[in-house]
Amino acid sequence: TDHHLPAAELPNADVIVSPDQPGCGCASKSIAGVGVTFRAPMALRGELRTRGVFDAATQPKLDVLLPLVALGTVADVVRLDANNRRLVAQGLKRVRALAMPCGLASLFVASGRSAPVATTFDFGFALGPRINAAGRLSDMTLGIECLLTDDPARADELAKTLDGINRERRVIEGDMREQAMLVAESL
């Protein structure tokens, strides 16, 4: 579903969503999985609007997802082509206006970053590592729950947990770097 190249032989599936599959005319070949996931409901919304199910005033408001799309795009370290840059810019605009899920706001607080002046640095080096650390050292669903919860108290609790896991990851990483240096010096 993203910027990774599909295998030479594709699985037997009803639907394969990948901008890199043969015959796909997608202009943004480096779109992250979160961007593909965001584009799917956008396309469905457009089709339903065309069929008269709703109009522009009554259609689902998908822009509320842009802060998560921006975070995922930066944290996935994809090339910031025009499409990805636009998604990140729109997501950052909402974050700076404090129009974001409470879990994202809690992650800003737990990481000591300021949402009103958020940059891609915050996504790539403060929030993203906290979410990813849970998947490496604990349970990846902690990060997902933090981003998706509507309960501010639960979001705060999860963000603090994620921050603690990330601190543990940094200690482990530092120990590994120190061990590698000792091995390198002994050669």
What spans do the regions from the language model cover?
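Active-site flanking residues adjacent to catalytic metal/cofactor-binding acidic residues
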Residues: T1-H3, A75
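Short, glycine/polar-rich helix-capping loops at beta-to-alpha or helix-loop-helix junctions
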Residues: H3-N12
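Amphipathic alpha-helical transducer elements in NTP-driven molecular machines
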Residues: L10, I31-V34, F38, R85-A89, ...
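Short alpha-helices
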Residues: N12-F54, L62-V74
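Hydrophobic helix-and-loop "lid/oligomerization" segment in the mid-to-C-terminal part
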Residues: G46-L187
